[in-house]
UniProtKB/Swiss-Prot annotation:
Keyword Secreted: no
Protein species of origin: Cryptococcus neoformans var. neoformans serotype D (strain B-3501A)
PANTHER family reported for this sequence: SUPPRESSOR OF TY 5, TRANSCRIPTION ELONGATION FACTOR SPT5
Protein name: Transcription elongation factor SPT5
Subunit structure: Component of the SPT4-SPT5 complex. Interacts with RNA polymerase II.
Amino acid sequence: MSDIEIKSSPPESPAEEQEERRLAGRKRARAVDPDEEDDDTQVVNNQDEENNPKEDDGEEGGNAQAEGADEGEDDEDEDEDDDDDDEDEDDEDDDGERRAKRRRKQKKFRFLDVEAEVDDEDEEEDEDNDYGDVAEFIDEAPEDVGARDDHQHRRLNRVFGRNEEEDVHDIVQRLKERHAGAARYNGDSDAVPQRLLMPGVNDPSLWKVVVKSGREHAICASIFRKVFAQQYSANPIDVISVFCRDSIPGMIFIEARQSASVSAAVNGIVGIFMSRGVNLVPIEEMAPLLKMKKKDVNLTPGMWVRMKRGKHAGDLAQVVDVDQITSGVVGIKFIPRIDLTPREKRKERIAIGKPGGVRPPARLFAYDDVRKIYGRQSVRQGAQGSYLFDNDEYVDGFCIKDVKIPAVATEDVNPTLEEISRFTGDDDSTAKFDLSAIADANKNLSTSLLFPGDKIEVYEGEQTGLYGIVEAVSPDVIAIKAEGGEVHGQTVEVPARSVRKRFDVGEHVKVLGGKHTDASGMVVEVKGDIVTLMSDLGEQEIKVFSKDLRKAADTTNLTVTKGLYDVHDMVMLDSTTAGVVTKVEGGLLRILDQNGAAKSVSPEQVSIRRDNKRFAVATDSQGNDMKVGDNMKETDGEMRQGEVFNIFRSIFVFLYNREYTDNFGVFVARANSLISVTPKSAVNDLTKINPALNQQLPYGGASLMPAPTANLNRNRLINTLVVVTKGTSKGLIGVIKDVQGENARVELKHNNKTLSVNLASLKRKDQKTGATFPLEMAGIASAAGGYGARPNAGQYDINPYGGATAMHPSMGGQTPALMGGRTPAARFGQTPNPYAAGVQNGKTPNPYAAGVGGKTPSAANASGGKTPAWGASGGKTPAYGMASGGKTPAYGMQGGKTPNAYAMAPPGPSGGRTPAYGAYGRPEASGSRPSVMAPPSAPYSAPYSAPTPAGNGAPTPAIPGNPYTAPTPYGAPTPYAAPTPGMPSLSAPTPGPGAGIAPTPFGAPTPYGAQSYGASAQQQRGLPWDWALDFRNVIVEIGPSYRPGSRNPLHFKRGFFDGKRFGYNDIIGENVRAILLDDPSVVEEIPAEYLRPAKADSQGQVVVVIGGGPEQKGQQRTTQYENGGSWMMELEGGDMAPLVVDGADLCRIWKV
C-alpha cells in the first residue's frame, strides 16, 4: 500500500469514524463516470486482493494461542469465516453505496483543489518492492472503506460543480441583491430633489415687462448696472434676477418680491413700455420659462444647411464631411463670396467714406480672376485640382470649409430650385438635370407655407395617397378635409412632415419664392415635388417646387400681357414705391424707382401702371408750378437738367435727357431741389383777387402785409445750437458758424471740429430743455411774447390738458401747444397771435407771422398754406387738400368770385358769391348776406382780412360733423368776453347777429368745409383718393367716390354698403379685398376711391397715422385723450413730448 494511501487512514477515534459513516450515509448514490470506470474497477480489485491476506493475518493473530486444535474445527471455522467474509463484503457493499454521496465541500474550498492525487499502479508496485524489507515491521491497519469513497466523491463533486456552475448574470444579480441597501439621507449632500426646486408662494415672484423688440439683452444689461450701482446706497433695488428669452421677443422677466421693486428697476430706461404695465407671471409658468430645450442636430452628408454668420449669412451650403462631428465641426461646401473689386477702386471707395466691407456677390471660384486682383502668390494649387486661397480650399469652384455646428442652421432651410441648381453647375431653371437628386431637400414642407384652403396630399406613411383641403395648421399636425375614398368629407389629422402641396394640370398658379417670384402661369406637368408651369408672359416653361406655389386668384382683369408696358411708363412696385420703365428687354423690365435704384423685374412683379401724366403737378424750389413737359435743372448736387415726363405724389420728379447714358437718360430728383430752366412769372398775386388784403392800417398806417422775401434769412441761423439728425455724424451737437447755400458749417462741441452738413440734416436744440425743433424756427421764431402772449409765461401748466401757457418761449402766442388754434383748448391748443411767429400758428392767416407749417399761410413762403397770401404755395382758399389753384371751392370745383369787400348790398344771383353745394332751401342760398364791412369812408371798422361770406353758401360753421368748420358757432353772437388776446381794431367781422366785431385776432378761420358733391373730407384734408393703397390691416367706411375724373359710379353697388365698415389686408391693383365687420362672410373687392378712414371714437384704440408729415405718417399709436377733434396719444419710449394728431389723420387698425 502506498504512502499516500496510508495518509488516508481511517479516523483516529471511533466517534469520528461513526460521524463520518453517518455523513456518508446521507450522501446520494452517484453514477460512475465512464472515464473513471476502469480505474475504479481496478482499485476495487486491488482492495479485494489486499483484504484477503489481511483477514488471514488477523485470523492467525487472533487464534495464535489455540494451538493443537483440530483441523476439522479449523475447517468449520474457515467455513464460518467465509460466511462472515461474505456477510462483511455485503455489508461493505451496502456501506459503499451509502457512502457514494460524499459530503459537501466547505465554502472556502469551493474553488480550490485541496485533494492529493493517487499514484498509479506501477508506482505502487515499485513502492512495495522498496519497502519489502520492512514489510513485516510496519503494522498495517485494515483500510477504512470511507477514505476510498471520499476520494471518489470528491472527483465526482468537481464534475457536478462544473455542470451546476451558475450563469454570470445570475451571480451579478445575486451580488447586487446582497449588497444593495436602502439609501440613507445625507444632510451634507448637495443633491436636492427636483420637486423641492419648484417655486412656491413663499418664493420671489416673476414679473414680465414689455420692451422694444430687439433690445431685450441691452435692457437687461442696463438693469444689471442700475441694480449694482445702487446696491450699497440708501435705497437699494430689491431685484434678484433679470433675464430674457430669444424665443419670446419684446419681453423681459424680472424676479422680485414686489412690483414696486420692478418699477424702480426699469424706471428711466429707454425702450421699456411702462404703459403696458408690470404683469405677474403665474407660478405654474415660472419653471417652463427657465427650461432649455436642447435639440439634437442630425447632420448627414448631402444635407442642405444655411450659414448664419459673416458675409455668407443666409447662403445655402451642403454638408460634405461629418467625420469630426463628435468634435462639433462639420465640413460644408458653398459658393464663395470673393471681392473682385480692383484695389484702386477699393481705396477710392474707402477714401470717399463709403463702407469698405460691402458684401460681394456669390460666384464660383475662378483662378484667373482671383490671380489678376490679388496676384499670383496669393493662390496656391493643391492636390486633385484644388486651390488654396486666403486659408480656404476651393474645389470645382466651391469653397470647402470646416465650421462649427452652431454656425449653420439646419431648420427651415427651404432651398429654392434656383439655389440648388447652382450646385449642379447650371443656373438655368429649364436645364436638363436630375431633379430627383435635389427634391429630397424639399420633402419636409414647412407649415408656415400652408394656409387653410390649400390642397395637399400625403406622400408617405400609413395614409399615403390621401388628399384634401387644409382646414387647420399646427406646427406638427395638419387637419384636412379628405376628398375621395372611404373618409370623404371627414376631417383627418396628418403629420406635417408627410404632406406636400397638390396641383392639377390646368390650374392657374402663382410662384411665391425664388427667381420667378410673383410669376403666374398654368400647370402643364406635375412630377412628384416638381411642378412645370407655362408662364403667362413669354410663354416659357418654369420648373419650381410645389411648396413654392399657390393657387392664383382670379386675375382675369389684371393678367399682364406682352407689350402692355412701354418706355417711360410709371408703374407701382408695391403700395409705396413707384418707378418708371427705362427699357423693355425680352420678358424683363428695366425700372428706375423713386429712390434712384435701378432694377430688373418681370411684369409679374409690377402691381399696376399709373397713367397720371395729365394730372401730375409739383412745386419747385421757388414755389412755381411744374408739370409734365417742363425743362428743369437741379439746384445742387450734379446740377443735371432734363425734361419732366412724370411726377409721383408731387415729390419725386422723373426727368429725361438723352445726353446721359446712365439708366438710358432717365434720372429722378425731388421737386424742392429743382428750378425751371426757362424763366417763369411769379406766382399769382392773389391780393388782386381779394382787395381786402390791401386795406391800410387805421389812421393811414402802412399795409399790414408787406411782401416778404421768398426764402428764409439764413444769416439768423448763425450761432444757433443744433443737433445732426442724419448721416455719419448723427446725434452730435454743435453750433452753426456759417451758411452756404443748402449747407451749413457746424462746429462740434465735443472736439471743436467743423463739418459741412446739409440744412435738412439739422435740427435746432434748446439749451435748457434739450428739446429739438425744426431748424427754420431759428430764423422765424422770436422770443416769447408779442401781442397776445402772456408775460413771463412758464413752460408747463399745472393742468396737463388745458390752460393757456405757451409750451415754449419761442412758440410765440400759443395757447398752450403746437397744434392749436382753439379757445379754450387742451394743452396742445393755441390761439393765433397776429404779431407772434410760430410753427402752426393758427388756422387763420397771420400777416406778421411766418407760420411755417401752419394750416393757413401767412405772409411768408409757408409750405402747405391754403388761404392765399404772398408767396403761398398753391394759394388756395379751400380747406386741406384742394388740388386746384387759387379758387374758392364750389360745386364741380369751379371757382367763384369772392364778394366785393366794398359792396353794401348782396350781389346778384350768379356772381360774387362763394358757391357751395346745397342751399337747403334758404332764400339767401344764391347770394351773400349783407356785408358787415364798413365803406371806405369809415376806415376805422375796415377789416384787414378777407370778409367771410354769409348765407348758407359759406355757413360758419358748415354742416354738422364737418371737421373743417370754423370754431365760431353760426347763428349766435361771438362772446365779446372771450379771453383771446388780440387787437380789437384788427379783428375780422365774425358772422352773426349784429355788426359788432368780436375780439378774435385777425380774422376767424372760415374756409368753407361743407361736403361737396363729388368731393369729400379726405380730399379737403389732403388725403389722396388712393390713400388706402398705402396701408393694410385698417378699418374703412364706404362712401361716395371722390376720385377726380372717375368714370365709376358715384356709389359703390348703388350705395348698398354706404356707411358700413370693412377691414382689409389684401390689395389688388387699385382695389382692396375687404371683409364686412358685421358679417365676416361678406367679402367684397372695393375700389380705393370709395374708402374713407374709420375715425377713432374712444380712448385706448390702436390707430395708425395716415396723414400729416413724413415723421408721423405710418406710426401706430394708442389714443389717450381727445379735444376739439385732435387726439393726444399715449407716450412711448423715446417721446420727448406728447404726440397730438388731428382726428382726420387717424384710422383705426383692424386686427391688433
